[in-house]
From Swiss-Prot:
Modified residues (Pyrrolidone carboxylic acid): 18
Function: Growth hormone plays an important role in growth control and is involved in the regulation of several anabolic processes. Implicated as an osmoregulatory substance important for seawater adaptation.
Keyword set, alphabetical order: Disulfide bond, Hormone, Metal-binding, Pyrrolidone carboxylic acid, Secreted, Signal, Zinc
InterPro entries the UniProt entry points to: 4_helix_cytokine-like_core (IPR009079), Somatotropin (IPR034975), Somatotropin/Prolactin (IPR001400), Somatotropin_CS (IPR018116)
GO cellular component annotations of the record: extracellular space
Provenance organism: Acanthopagrus butcheri (Australian black bream)
Cellular compartment(s): Secreted
The protein's name: Somatotropin
Coiled coil: none
Length: 204
C-alpha cells in the first residue's frame, strides 16, 4: 500500500511540474538564441572597430555617447534593481519590442559575411519564441496595451547614399545599438527564466 501511495505521489509530482519544465525548455531555447545574437553583435562591433583608425574610434565613440539608440524610446528598467522587480510578462514584452525594433534595421547589417546574413532569420526565430512565452505567461493580460503608440523610425536615412564619414558614423551607431539591445534582451530573458525556479538566486 505504501509503495502504491509513493508511486502515485511521484506521478502526481511529475504531472504538476510539467508546465514548468516546458516553460524552462522554451526559455532555455530563447536565452540560447539571444546569447548567440549578443556574441555575434559583439564580434561584428569589435571587427568594425578594429578596422578604424584610433582617432576615428575616439570620435565615433564620443558621438555615440551623446546620441541615442532608436530603441531607447521603448520604456524599460533603468537599472538592475528595477529589472529584478519587474514581472516575467513585463520583461518578455520589453524583450519582444526590442527584438521587433530590429526587424528593419537588421537588413542593413546583412551582406559581406555569413554571420551578418544570419542576423535577420535568427531575430525572427527569437521573436517567435518570445511571443510563445508571452502567450504562455500572459494569463489574460492585454498584450502590449500601448504598442499602438510605439512607432520607431528606421536607424538613419537609408534612402540616400551617405558620404564616407556619415557612413562610418551610421555603421558604428547601428552595430553599437544592436550590441546594446541584444545585451538588454539577454539580461531580461535570463532573469525571467530564473523566476521559474523559486529556489534560484536571480541576483544580477
Amino acid at each position: 500500500m505504501d509503495r502504491v501511495v509513493l508511486m502515485l505521489s511521484v506521478l502526481s509530482l511529475g504531472v504538476s511540474s510539467q508546465p514548468i519544465t516546458d516553460g524552462q525548455r522554451l526559455f532555455s531555447i530563447a536565452v540560447s538564441r539571444v546569447q548567440h545574437l549578443h556574441l555575434l553583435a559583439q564580434r561584428l562591433f569589435s571587427d568594425f572597430e578594429s578596422s578604424l583608425q584610433t582617432e576615428e574610434q575616439r570620435q565615433l565613440n564620443k558621438i555615440f555617447l551623446q546620441d541615442f539608440c532608436n530603441s531607447d524610446y521603448i520604456i524599460s528598467p533603468i537599472d538592475k534593481h528595477e529589472t529584478q522587480r519587474s514581472s516575467v510578462l513585463k520583461l518578455l514584452s520589453i524583450s519582444y519590442r526590442l527584438v521587433e525594433s530590429w526587424e528593419f534595421p537588421s537588413r542593413s547589417l546583412a551582406g559581406g559575411s555569413a554571420p551578418r546574413n544570419q542576423i535577420s532569420p535568427k531575430l525572427s526565430e527569437l521573436k517567435t519564441g518570445i511571443h510563445l512565452l508571452i502567450r504562455a505567461n500572459e494569463d489574460g493580460a492585454e498584450l502590449f496595451p500601448d504598442s499602438s503608440a510605439l512607432q520607431l523610425a528606421p536607424y538613419g536615412d537609408y534612402y540616400h547614399s551617405p558620404g564616407t564619414d556619415e557612413s562610418l558614423r551610421r555603421t558604428y551607431e547601428l552595430l553599437a545599438c544592436f550590441k546594446k539591445d541584444m545585451h538588454k534582451v539577454e539580461t531580461y530573458l535570463t532573469v525571467a527564466k530564473c523566476r521559474l525556479s523559486p529556489e534560484a538566486n536571480c541576483t544580477l
